[in-house]
Curated annotation (Swiss-Prot):
SUPFAM superfamilies: Apolipoprotein A-I. This is Uncharacterized protein R10E11.5. The lineage of its organism: Eukaryota, Metazoa, Ecdysozoa, Nematoda, Chromadorea. Residues 1-35 are annotated as: Disordered. Residues 1-11 have a biased composition (Basic and acidic residues).
Length: 444
């Protein structure tokens, strides 16, 4: 029942318009300025329009017009705004009286302000036709192509091999001529094993070295992009296509290219060289032993010299300390003598001043006795002045004594500071020398 009654009340009320961004109806927005204790929420709002304000019809006419005054000026916009200049006067109209469905009438094409965009008669650009690429016949890479690409240049290897054999032949001929000129001894034919060891190994430029048995030697492809089982299958299919037989190269070798047998003189020279090398090694061993003994002796000498240097350093330090102590004692004695002499002089001067004061007092007393009582006042003033002078003299004497004592203390303190500085320097130098000596001993 309560819900139905509330709905009936809401239906009985008129449709309210709410302010933007607020849940308060526009007709109750003026209540925000009224205090809460004086508010009457069941009051109804009354529209109070000012009497002097223009009517709604005037605003509608202005809103529907292009400008406030009829003129042929262009439809310009206010700077920094999307509102046309002809509608700028609408900002002064209250929101309640604005008409938002006003539309600006469109201009005719015959109007003076209407300017259509010029029509372009430029023809579209001709499309660039590129020549069609010819499809090349793609070559399918097979295992045979890889095998062919990995084979070395046999002709180039043979030419280099022949050039090296020619050079070797020339060197052998030179050795033969030298052997004939030196001696005419018989040539001993060595065993096949010795001949094999004397032959020089010839290296190919592009292919690896091949074993001695050329009939069974096979060189397999070194760099392949196939896997191991695939390579084995290709080799079994191609059989001996990838093998290099060296029988042709061995047939090209002439008998003259075979290295000649060395003579007995060369063997003797080799034995002499071996003896010389043994002697040189013995001499080197002897020199090493001698150098070790000399180094040990030098180390012993250096250790003795270092010990002597340490003793000399200690003696010099002791002598310098003794000399410094004697100098300090002499300085103390001189300071004490000077202080005593100055004190004696000051006492003598004070005694003289005291005697002179006594003489003056005696003279003043005799004069006072002789003079009359009228002059007593003057004599009293004179006596007061004399007493002040005496006090001043005594104070000056005391000041002189204090100054002399302070000077003596200062000289004594400066002497002690100098002695401390000298002792610190001597200690630092001694420590540094000892560390240097220890470091030298460690190196040795």
């Amino acid at each position: 029942m309560a819900s139905s009654a509330g709905r009936d009340k809401l239906r009985s009320r008129g449709q309210r318009v709410f302010a933007f961004g607020s849940s308060t109806p526009r007709d109750l927005s003026h209540m925000s300025k009224v205090p809460q204790n004086l508010r009457n929420y069941d009051a109804k709002s009354v529209d109070k329009s000012p009497s002097d304000a223009p009517s709604l019809h005037d605003y509608i006419v202005k809103a529907r017009s292009l400008s406030r005054e009829a003129c042929d000026s262009r439809n310009q916009f206010v700077f920094g705004s999307s509102t046309p200049r002809t509608l700028a006067h609408l900002d002064k109209i209250p929101h309640k009286q604005r008409v938002y469905d006003a539309k600006i009438p469109k201009k005719n094409t015959t109007h003076s302000d209407f300017k259509a965009a010029p029509i372009r008669f430029n023809a579209p650009p001709v499309p660039i036709t590129k020549p069609a690429k010819k499809e090349e016949n793609r070559h399918v890479i097979t295992s045979k192509d890889d095998d062919i690409a990995s084979e070395p240049d046999i002709v180039q290897d043979r030419e280099e091999f022949m050039n090296e054999m020619k050079k070797h032949k020339i060197e052998l001929e030179k050795k033969k001529s030298l052997g004939k000129n030196d001696s005419k001894t018989t040539i001993e034919i060595p065993t096949p094993k010795a001949a094999e060891t004397q032959q020089e190994h010839v290296k190919f430029a592009h292919a690896p070295e091949i074993a001695g048995n050329s009939q069974k030697a096979v060189r397999i492809q070194s760099e392949t992009q196939e896997e191991a089982p695939v390579a084995v299958k290709n080799l079994s299919a191609n059989k001996m296509n990838d093998q290099i037989e060296v029988s042709q190269l061995m047939n090209e070798i002439t008998p003259e290219s075979v290295p000649a047998v060395e003579s007995l003189d060369n063997q003797k020279n080799a034995n002499v060289v071996g003896d010389l090398l043994a002697k040189v090694q013995k001499v080197a061993d002897d020199t090493i032993d001698k150098s070790k003994t000399t180094v040990a002796a030098d180390v012993a000498k250096m250790s003795g010299a270092l010990q002597k240097a340490e003793e000399e350093v200690v003696q010099t330090i002791d002598q310098t300390v003794k000399n410094i102590k004697s100098n300090v004692n002499e300085v103390k004695k001189d300071v004490e003598k000077n202080i005593a002499e100055k004190v004696d002089d000051i006492t003598k001067e004070l005694e003289k001043s005291a005697k002179s004061l006594e003489e003056t007092t005696d003279k003043i007393g005799s004069k006072i006795d002789n003079t009359s009582q009228a002059i007593k006042s003057n004599l009293e003033e004179a006596s007061l002045k004399t007493e002040k002078s005496v006090n001043d003299a005594v104070k000056s004497g005391e000041k002189l004594i204090g100054d002399l004592a302070s000077e003596a203390k200062k000289t004594f303190d400066s002497a002690e500071q100098k002695l401390d500085a000298k002792f610190s320097k001597i200690g630092s130098t001694a420590d540094s020398t000892l560390e240097d000596v220890k470091n030298g001993l460690r190196h040795f």
